[in-house]
Amino acid sequence: MKTVLIALLRFYKVAVSPMLGNRCRFYPSCSDYAREAIQYHGAARGTYLAVRRVCRCHPFSAGGVDLVPPPNSDTRARGEADARSHRL
């Protein structure tokens, strides 16, 4: 499944992206982020991370550097811990 998803991303990068122009507000671009996320985290978790990233890429977003989290990090637990610390 990973191979199929990465092939689809390569097709998008070569065939579709040049027609749309560079619109991504983040570095790396959303398609590069998706490819890295799928390579490092597998098809299911990588796709989840990529969809979250694309949802953050909109005209009202400041953008910037947004790297794929390392494979051993649990982003959900970290986010929940941050939310708890803000409630204190």
From Swiss-Prot:
Region (Disordered): 68-88
Disulfide bonds: none
SMART domains: Haemolytic
GO cellular component: plasma membrane
Membrane-traversing stretches: none
Membrane topology, as annotated: Peripheral membrane protein
Subcellular localization(s) per the UniProt record: Cell inner membrane
Domain of life: Bacteria
UniProt signal peptide: none
The protein's name: Putative membrane protein insertion efficiency factor
